[in-house]
Amino acid sequence: GKIDELDVKGTCDYAAPARAIYWGARQIMIEVGALQPGDVVDYEIAKKGFTYALLTAGDEDESRFIPPMRGQFYDIVPFWSNTPTVRKVYVVSIPMEKELQFQFYQGECASSMRYEDGCKKYSFVMNDMVPFAKEPNMVDLFDAAPKLMMSSTPQWKDKSLWFNKVNEDYGSFAPLPEAQKKVDELVKGKNTEMEKIAVLTHWVADNIRYSGISMGKGEGFTLHNTKMNYTDRCGVCKDIAGTLISFLRMAGFEAYPAMTMAGSRVESIPADHFNHCVAVVKLSNGTYMPLDPTWVPFCRELWSSAEQQQNYLPGVPEGSDLCITPVSSPENHYVRIKADNRLAADGTPVSYTHLTLPTT
């Protein structure tokens, strides 16, 4: 056989397809030509610093690679493929003074750690990977297929404390006079804490449109401030949750942001396997109640029943471990059937059936 080297200068840089979230993502593509049976595509991807930072193009300034949580590294590496793969190798090098915890889930791989060039070098290898078999309505592949999770952060509480501080320092939930006027209007005549929480949650859910426009460097873990959200009346989940947190605080509640993963499990390794931002509010009994205004527009729920047994991490000042939402009570999801079957005098069967479903 022979080896054909592809010139990476021939890559094409395109705007990535986007819907509802327009954060300027790019996709880099290259044509490899027609492949014949037995051909193998061998490629290597090098990454530096943070794995999800929405970095913009520019000069090779090292500050571009500083992660939001400074000094910390994590990665989530799928070890499955949609195409037959001869060999996959993942290597990460970290400074000698750093510690890294990891775990391989739902499969096996060859792993090692070596001291090389003044660094710790971790390697993970899997051979002869075949496409993972899928089933109708199955769980997310991250919950079933082989994956590697790693993080230099010791525990979830550290991430919780950082998430709280980065948004409090930024002033994400600072009060706004015109928003305060709306809050006062909404809670007027509401006597219980749940009445107030409900009316604020549903106003935000129904009035902040889901449409994310990039605001530049602040995208990521930092929630946009009250003025921007209330003025624009649009944003992604973090903007909708941030608006609710601001409203709750202006109504006298203690509320904070939380990160969650809609659709799959979050592991005990504190790698940021999150795709969604929600809110938590402290009730009078001292417990935190999760709220998701993004998922409850024009319905009666405060936390979508589609998000049962879902992991989330509150960014609270005392710090928190990874939490999980409870199972929604069966009484909230009933189907009542009342049937009346009779025989008429002439022997004709007569049946009446009445179905009652919960309204949401």
What residue spans do the PLM features occupy?
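Short, solvent-exposed loop/turn segments at the edges of secondary structure
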Residues: 25, 36, 85, 117, ...
